[in-house]
């Protein structure tokens, strides 16, 4: 919690940014302890990548993109001991916060691939059901953004210093 000072951004690792993250940073609201995309949906798939079970539950995927107001007094509850002793549901559902302290971000900042239809304005795409790197999953998933995932992976692996196949 950065010694309970300033702001922080958390994002899951199964995402790609399609816009400048500074634009997300500009959405900070000092009156909120956290800001998230407040998804309200039922999943289209009961199974995720590699056969993982996928269930519906309250505030699903809210904690996958978070603007944390680390200095907000309500976040002083989030200590290492709290995180160690709380259930995953308690942490991911922000149970230490009153509802009015959880601010809303535009859905485009945590666009759920497959769960939502294609959106050319999505600023951050979340491959919450599985990334296209899982070949079996990618072949049957119907991902709207698989090509973008693979393009970004190639850019990540690319080196102008070497003309070697990866």
Regions found by a protein language model. Name each.
Residues 1-44:
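GT-A fold catalytic core of metal-dependent nucleotide-sugar glycosyltransferases
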Residues 3, 58-60, 119:
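A generic fold-level signal
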Residues 12, 54-56, 93, 113:
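Short, flexible coil/linker segments at or flanking structured domains
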Residues 27-91:
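Conserved catalytic core of nucleotide-sugar-dependent glycosyltransferases
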């Amino acid at each position: 919690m950065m010694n309970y000072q300033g702001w922080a951004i958390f994002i899951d690792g199964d995402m790609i940014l399609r816009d400048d993250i500074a634009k997300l940073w500009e959405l900070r609201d000092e009156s909120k302890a956290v800001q998230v995309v407040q998804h309200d949906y039922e999943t289209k798939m009961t199974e995720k990548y590699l056969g993982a079970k996928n269930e519906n539950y309250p505030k699903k995927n809210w904690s996958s993109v978070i603007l944390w107001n680390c200095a907000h007094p309500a976040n002083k509850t989030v200590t290492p001991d709290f995180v160690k002793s709380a259930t995953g549901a308690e942490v991911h559902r922000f149970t230490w916060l009153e509802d009015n302290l959880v601010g809303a971000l535009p859905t485009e900042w945590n666009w759920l691939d497959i769960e939502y239809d294609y959106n050319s304005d999505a600023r951050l795409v979340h491959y919450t059901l599985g990334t296209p790197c899982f070949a079996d999953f990618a072949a049957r998933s119907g991902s709207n953004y698989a090509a973008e995932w693979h393009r970004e992976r190639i850019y990540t692996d690319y080196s102008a210093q070497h003309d070697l196949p990866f």
